[in-house]
Amino acid sequence: ASSGAHLTKYSNVTDPVAGQKLLIVDPAITPDAALFDYSITESVPMGTTLDGALDGIAHTFEAFCGAKSETYELLQKLAVTCLDLILENAPKLMSDPTNTEAREALGLATDLGGYAIMVGGTSGAHLTSFSLVDLAAHGAACGIMNPYYAVLYTPAIQPQMKVIGRVLKKYGFAAPDTEELSGRALTEAVAKGLIAFGKSIHAPTRLTDLDGFGEKHVQRILAAAKDPSLSMKLQNMPVPMTAEDVVPYMESVIRGAMDGDLSKILIKE
């Protein structure tokens, strides 16, 4: 399990031979209380810390993109606060790994991510990440995929893209005119902003950035997406899908993410 696991009903089991992760979802594993001393993260590699940050963004971003009317306001606050904390403090921590305040900020941000997925839920990027366990850490895999899935979700997430675009612009990762855009142009501008942040912390931003990625992973991803045990991720997408939609729609996302080409992604109206 990755960031926020100490707060949530989610865990997982990974088959290292098949290279596939599967979910455990049960309210019984939600703790009555949790204690996280963020200072213990000082001893872990910087890559692990930043992977947690990427996972925190993924949790709040995916939950916010899938928000219903009754949860929209709360998930917006969680997404904006999480992004603010991470975009401001990740660069500080890279410059000074002993910066206690920056480390605590990232810890709080990822805790908000855990809260977000208890209110909403994750979707496409998390689903794909489960098939990349032999190549990438969880947060990095989600961080690669969310910009590309956002384009797929374009018709359903325009208000969310305006909000996320504002935060990215605040930290110099999105163009000044992002909020004036609409439709696919807006979503692609936000996607490019998320990719720019990933590059700024030296994270992979394309599937081909992962050493060893190949066609077998594409087929593994598509096969897993059709697995009934993971159907909740398809159904939880802002543009809900079934196994029959995996090809061509989800496949177009994977092909686009392979070489960083947003134009390859098909949109399901």
Mark where each language-model region is.
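Catalytic nucleophile loop
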Residues: A1-G4, H138
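Carboxylate- and glycine-rich phosphate/diphosphate-binding segment that chelates Mg2+/Mn2+
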Residues: L7-G120
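Catalytic cores of large soluble enzymes that bind and process phosphate-bearing ligands
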Residues: P45, T49, T71-L78, T98, ...
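Short alpha-helical scaffolding segments that buttress acidic/His motifs in well-ordered protein cores
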Residues: I57-F61, C82, L106-G114, T128, ...
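Hydrophobic packing residues in well-ordered alpha-helices of helical domains and bundles
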Residues: A79, R103-L106, M161, T187, ...
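C-terminal catalytic subdomain
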Residues: G120-A191, I195
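C-terminal charged capping/lid subdomain of soluble metabolic enzymes
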Residues: G172-E269
